[in-house]
Regions:
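Short solvent-exposed beta->alpha transition segments
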Residues: 64-112
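Exposed beta-sheet edge and beta->alpha loop/turn motif
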Residues: 119-193
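Short glycine-rich, low-complexity/disordered patches
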Residues: 53-69, 113-118, 174-182
Length: 193
């Protein structure tokens, strides 16, 4: 098992081990919140890597499809990704899978996508339905270049909605509650050269 998968499994186990304590309390303890925040930021960083792989023109289609499947698992159902461009005021929103497919099919010979300055801009807040919602901001640097000299570059500031909710699973015949983190809509807030 790869180190990353082991870490993810250990993180999940850690979240599940505290489920009994969490089930007794309505609020998330500061220690648990810190673990949830770390998991949320890890999922955002994973998405950053997946987007770079999907957009890379050297990635085989079969590999890109596999990575799209993995990336989709990070999101809550119905989530959308905003897409902007310099010289166009409107932001267009696509369902997550459609965004990945369009990214993979961009008409450039070389594409580089880097995310940086990833941080929370709002604390997790409890919602009436019992889940918690927060927002993570990222900056995305996009560079596309064609062999015929066509070049496009922009930097986009994006806000990612983070959902944290209690879920249940069966482990050795026992029902165990745990906190899960899912990504939601990714909204464009600013696009610059």
């Amino acid at each position: 098992m790869k180190l990353k998968n082991k870490f993810a499994l250990l993180s999940l186990c850690g979240l599940m081990l505290s489920a009994n304590l969490m089930a007794q309390a309505d609020d998330v303890s500061p220690q648990r919140k810190q673990a949830i925040d770390s998991l949320a930021l890890e999922k955002v960083r994973d998405l950053s890597k997946y987007i770079s792989i999907i957009g890379n023109k050297k990635t085989a289609f079969s590999e890109a499809s596999r990575v799209m499947d993995r990336a989709e698992e990070l999101f809550a159902p119905g989530s959308e990704m905003g897409v902007s461009a310099l010289g166009r005021e409107a932001v267009i929103y696509f369902p997550i899978r459609k965004y990945f497919e369009r990214l993979n099919a961009l008409n450039y010979d070389r594409v580089t996508i880097k995310w940086y300055n990833i941080h929370y801009i709002s604390d997790l807040e409890r919602q009436p339905d019992g889940r918690y919602v927060g927002v993570v901001t990222i900056y995305q640097r996009f560079e596309g270049e064609s062999d015929d000299g066509l070049k496009y570059k922009d930097t986009t500031k994006k806000d990612i909605t983070i959902y944290v909710e209690r879920k249940k699973t069966q482990i050795e015949g026992r029902t165990v509650e745990f906190w899960d983190v899912l990504l939601g809509d990714i909204r464009v807030t600013e696009t610059t050269a």
